[in-house]
Amino acid sequence: EGDIEVDVDTIHFGYPDGVAHNAETLMYDNVEQILYIVDKYDNSDAMGVIYSLPFRTDYEGMQVLTEWTKLGSGQYFMNPTGGDISPDGSKIIVKNEPFMLIWERNEGESVADAMARRPKQVKAYKKESQGEAIAWLDSTTFHTTSDSDVNEPIYMYTKNINDAVENVV
C-alpha cells in the first residue's frame, strides 16, 4: 500500500559509431556483472549486434558500449525483440517474432563468445504477435508474453531445454 521511494541511478551510454540504434534487448549477466544490449540490425548482412558495458554503480559521464559480435545472418536473427541470461549464466535466450534461440555457455566463457556460436532453436515456441518479453526463472524454465492485447497470457516453458531445441542451420 502507498508509495515506495527508491533510488535511481542513470547510465548515460552511446554506441561506438556515435549513432542511435534500435535496440529492445537488454540482458544482465550475473556471472560477469556485465550489461548486454542487442540491437535489431546494423544495415548489413548480419542481423543484430551484441554490445556490452561492465555494470557498476558509480558511472560518471557518457559510457561507450563495446561491440562484440553479430548474431548471424538470415531469418533466425532478424529483429531481436527480447532476451535474457539465466541466473546461473549457463544459458542465453534471444527471441524475435518467429523464433526463440538458445545458446549454451561453457564455464569461464563470456556471453559474447558463447553467442558467437550457432544457437539452438526452441521447437515448442508458441508464436506471439508482439512477443517481446522473455525471462529465465532458472536454467531450465523461462516465461514469455506479448504486449499486443489487454489479456495476453504468460507462457511458461519448463521442458528439459535439451529435448526442446534443434540446431539452427
Go through the PLM ranges and name each one.
Residues 1-164:
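Sequence/structural signature of beta-propeller domains
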